[in-house]
Amino acid sequence: MSAPRTLYDKIFDDHVVDRQDDGTCLLYIDRHLVHEVTSPQAFEGLRLSGRKVRHPEKTLAVVDHNVSTSPERKFGIKNEESRIQVEALAKNAKDFGVEYYSENDIRQGIVHIIGPEQGFTLPGMTIVCGDSHTSTHGAFGALAHGIGTSEVEHVLATQTLIQRKAKNMLVRVDGQLPEGVTAKDIILAIIGEIGTAGGTGYVIEYAGEAIRSLSMEGRMTICNMSIEGGARAGLIAADETTFAYVKDKPRAPKGAAWDAALAYWKTLQSDEGAHFDKVIVLDAAKLPPIVSWGSSPEDVVSVQGVVPNPEEITDENKRTSKIRALDYMGLTPGTKITDIALDRVFIGSCTNGRIEDLRAAAKVIEGKTVNPRVNAMIVPGSGLVKEQAEAEGLDKIFLAAGFDWREPGCSMCLAMNDDRLKPHERCASTSNRNFEGRQGFKGRTHLVSPAMAAAAAIAGHFVDIRDWK
């Protein structure tokens, strides 16, 4: 009888093509997502060596990082470097026979949103992309992680990837979430608990009642930020919620193929007694709405808390780092989070740009008006999300309140397009990173949930969504 295995063990082992004595493995890759930023050199490498894309049908390309989200984007991209990257992806996809979603395609959007929408992402698969937030797809019980440009070329050419097996970590969130606390708060709390290096060398499996109770979109938010906790990937075992989400997607198996896939997917659970190298347990009932205060995703505190005092940190290097973060953020220890005034609000990204995120924001916003000193924008994660939101009338709620309603793309998550902060502007953002300069030179980012961001836009400062009327 074989030893009990974790979900990660099972998926990894099922995809090993070759294993060396030193533990290095060659893994078969089921799905490869490609965008304009990390792929040009990879395609050029194929071209120079006379190679083809080995499995174009397992590859899907989309523009997301550099595209404008302005309604005027049909007139083209102003920035020359960004325009060249977008044009290069269109040409490379055509030359190598890869399916491509341009900015004029209703299916276009952020790569980690369009994969699940199309059923390109399925349980039990190995999925890679030249993007760190590929871990998002782990919400489906898939082994998904980012790769570098040289690895992008390797996967395009061979449909395989050289890997070493990571260690197993279990993060269990027990109990039920309180009203007003979301998947975004869960993952920020986890990162606050383990730190941004806590998951280094691990693949995290998320489990527990609070995780199981989440929708697929909530689960994607959790897995999306696994990388911010230092992990290689994040996984949530597939269940009936997963199967219901996947079933009618365009690329999902049909008929007998669906039945066979379902039978296999149901085996992809961690066995009882499977060994985890590290276990973290959180009590969902004790989690508050969370706001980041510094320049690292681990710098988090309850919305009812205060900006911490770095002088109380005993580790000298960490203390110095947090003092720098406070200086960058323009904050003073002891300041109430609810006293922090805002200039900008961004609702979108591969973390929180899906239809449920927009519904949550609309529920808070309806009948209200954006604070006069706040510039607020909502960016749907894909053309299909935008279409659905408009069918539900959410755009009218946003526009009536004074929000900008944009075209799909990565937008203000990162300063690679026209949507960015000016120096010292302070932003409540539903994205995943609050690094220095992430949203623009000297821009100041606070990570929050969509409902918290929406309420902050109306109030002009952070408020506890649990008290929102």
Swiss-Prot record:
Record's keyword terms, sorted: 4Fe-4S, Amino-acid biosynthesis, Branched-chain amino acid biosynthesis, Iron, Iron-sulfur, Leucine biosynthesis, Lyase, Metal-binding
Keyword Metal-binding listed: yes
GO biological process: L-leucine biosynthetic process
Keyword Iron found: yes
Reaction(s) the record says it catalyses: (2R,3S)-3-isopropylmalate = (2S)-2-isopropylmalate
Domain of life, per lineage: Bacteria
Matches recorded under InterPro entries: 3-IsopropMal_deHydase_lsu (IPR004430), Acnase/IPM_dHydase_lsu_aba_1/3 (IPR015931), Acoase/IPM_deHydtase_lsu_aba (IPR001030), Aconitase_4Fe-4S_BS (IPR018136), Aconitase_4Fe-4S_dom (IPR036008), IPM_dehydratase_rel_enz (IPR050067), IPMI_cat (IPR033941)
Cofactor: [4Fe-4S] cluster
CC cofactor note: Binds 1 [4Fe-4S] cluster per subunit.
Pathway: Amino-acid biosynthesis; L-leucine biosynthesis; L-leucine from 3-methyl-2-oxobutanoate: step 2/4
Enzyme Commission code(s) on record: 4.2.1.33
Molecular function via GO: 3-isopropylmalate dehydratase activity; 4 iron, 4 sulfur cluster binding; metal ion binding
Binding site for [4Fe-4S] cluster: 350, 410, 413
Enzyme class: lyase
Free-text function comment from the UniProt entry: Catalyzes the isomerization between 2-isopropylmalate and 3-isopropylmalate, via the formation of 2-isopropylmaleate.
Binding partners and assembly: Heterodimer of LeuC and LeuD.
Family listed: Belongs to the aconitase/IPM isomerase family. LeuC type 1 subfamily.
Name of this chain's protein: 3-isopropylmalate dehydratase large subunit
Species: Mesorhizobium japonicum (strain LMG 29417 / CECT 9101 / MAFF 303099) (Mesorhizobium loti (strain MAFF 303099))
